[in-house]
Amino acid sequence: NASFVEEKTHPLFALRVRDFRLYWLALVTQVVGQHMFAFTLGWLTFEITGSQAQLGLVHLCGFVPQFALTLLGGVLADRIDARRLIGAAQANAAIAMILVGAVTLLGVAQLWHLALGAFLWGLSAAIDEPARASFFPRLLPRPLLRSAVPLISMAFGSSRVIAPSIAGFLIAAAGAPATFLVCAAAVSTMVAVLFLVHPAHSAARPHESLLNSFTESLRYIRANEAFARVIGVALLNATLAMGFIHMLPVFAKDVLQVDSRGLGILAAAAGVGSLAGFISYSWLQTRLTPRNLIVGALTVYNAALIGLAFSEWYWLSFCAILVAGLGHGYFVTGAQVILQTLVEDHYRGRVMSVFALVWSLMFLSGFLLNVAGEWAGPRLALAGGAAIVLAYVWLSLVRAKTLKKLVLVPKPG
């Protein structure tokens, strides 16, 4: 009945499972460290160079390994113990953060140091994202996936609330080097927790060539129109709009004229909105069809970004970012619920690695929007990208018959 379905999809239901609860707490800590690192790296880059284009270049260096290797990470996640992949990725991320912190502490930080730090972090994320997406479903019964996925999204949303504020105040109080070291400690937490959980056994699969394994997953996605539509619009939105978070240093300094604390509050607004979306998603998914939820979320998100682009007032910008975060929370969670619920286990790592390109494309988006902003101004760059996504959503996505009829029934393992 309806009350039973609502209980099973409530995020807190999955936290009753010990292993998933431990993993989720470690994930929150890890992602806080990651967002703090990205925030601090962007702030330091703009502080040292004062160049919007060079800020975009650092983001591009984080994007390249993620975009190039995330799909490989998905193939590896379907054939290697995901726990090993996650542990190795987070150890590498911690080393990168320590190295950037060290050169900053010594006062010798240059643009190439920051670009290298972004590259190493992107390399870690390329392996970590699909491995995590393949790993956490093995920590709890399959019927609880619709409860667990919003919690995973909530981990990212809560970190976006906490991380920018922590980073902004740490930078002001203790400096960037101390902030980088705190980031390294945070991401290392996941490595320790991996030894405390006991995931379900993952059945061995034939080890065909990497290329065949990858092309097989693309055929699988293409054969499922719902997957193709959801992943396609997610990648478009990531490329043209999600990089707005990497433009905030420019809006904060040049348009709104605030310091690192003010920038931290603006960045946190996106997290507050996303967190509100993640928390209320379980209620919303029982009242809207998956298609209507995704279309509505993308509309709210991109309309809010257009509002942000032309805002002259700090608190109006704050509200626009807050609303954008809400739309982002609904969309990302809804898309992942569709994919994680319907995908078959032996394709999970590869399918989710294609979706994980969303996060690496944020760096490309940051690069494109910042370069376009240098040429046409940040307002037109941001509004133009959001307008293109809105046009696609209403001219194409709303007409997709497969999404109209979509019912979320889990595939057997």
Residue positions per predicted region:
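Hydrophobic/aromatic positions within or immediately flanking transmembrane alpha-helices
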Residues: 24, 56-59, 86-87, 115, ...
